C-alpha cells in the first residue's frame, strides 16, 4: 500500500466542494508587504498605528464581532461605522497613550463560499500604555496571546474585513489595565 505525500483537501460534507481557498485568494488575503492593500496586513497595521481612515476603507458594511470569549458582547451585524466608533474610542484602541503591535503567527484559511473566508490566526498583541501622549514614559505593559477567527467577504473583487472572534490563551503583565474601558473602578482597586 502506498501513501500519497499530498494531504487531502477538506471538503464540505453537504456539497462535496472544497473548503480550500484558491492560491490567488491566499496571496490576496495574506500578503505581508507594507505597501499592500490587503485586509489581513492592513487590519493589523491600521490598528497598531491608529490609522483609522485606512482601517475604515477595508471594512465590510456589517461586521460579526464576537467578544464573548473575552467577557464582552457579541454583535451579529455591527455596522462599520459602529465598529470604527468602538475601536477608535479613547477607552479602547484610540487612546493616544496606548501603543500596540499585532503580530500574526500561524494561519490557515477556510473557504465558506466563493465570497466568504474565515482566517484562523495565532496572534500576539503587545501593548504599552504611556503616562502622556508624548510617549516618553511607560506606565504599564500588557500583552495578549490569542487565536482569532477573522471573517472576510469579497465585494467587487476585493476582500474586506467582516469581523472577528478572539479567544485569549493567556496574558502577560497588566493587560487588564491597558484599556480604560476594559475594567471597572472596583476592579482597579481590588
Swiss-Prot record:
It holds the Pfam family Scytalone_dh. It comes from Metarhizium anisopliae (strain ARSEF 549). The keyword Lyase applies. The active site is at 102, 127. This is Scytalone dehydratase-like protein Arp1. One of its GO terms (molecular function) is scytalone dehydratase activity. Homotrimer. Each subunit contains an active site, located in the central part of the hydrophobic core of the monomer, which functions independently. Belongs to the scytalone dehydratase family. Substrate binds at residues 67, 148.
Amino acid at each position: 500500500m502506498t501513501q500519497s505525500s499530498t494531504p487531502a483537501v477538506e471538503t464540505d460534507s453537504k456539497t462535496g466542494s472544497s473548503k480550500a481557498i484558491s492560491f490567488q485568494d491566499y496571496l490576496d488575503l495574506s500578503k505581508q508587504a507594507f505597501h499592500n492593500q490587503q485586509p489581513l496586513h492592513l487590519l493589523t497595521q491600521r490598528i497598531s498605528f491608529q490609522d483609522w481612515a485606512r482601517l475604515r476603507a477595508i471594512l465590510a458594511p456589517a461586521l460579526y464581532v464576537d467578544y464573548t470569549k473575552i467577557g464582552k458582547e457579541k454583535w451579529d451585524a455591527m455596522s462599520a461605522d459602529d465598529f470604527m466608533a468602538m475601536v477608535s474610542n479613547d477607552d479602547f484602541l484610540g487612546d493616544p497613550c496606548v501603543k500596540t503591535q499585532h503580530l500574526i503567527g500561524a494561519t490557515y484559511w477556510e473557504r465558506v463560499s466563493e465570497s466568504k473566508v474565515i482566517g484562523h490566526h495565532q496572534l500576539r498583541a503587545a501593548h504599552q500604555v504611556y503616562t502622556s501622549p508624548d510617549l516618553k514614559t511607560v506606565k504599564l505593559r500588557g500583552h495578549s496571546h490569542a487565536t482569532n477567527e477573522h471573517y472576510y467577504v469579497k465585494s467587487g473583487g476585493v476582500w474586506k474585513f467582516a469581523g472577528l472572534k478572539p479567544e485569549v490563551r493567556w496574558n502577560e503583565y497588566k493587560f487588564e489595565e491597558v484599556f480604560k474601558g476594559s475594567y471597572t473602578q472596583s476592579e482597579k482597586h481590588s
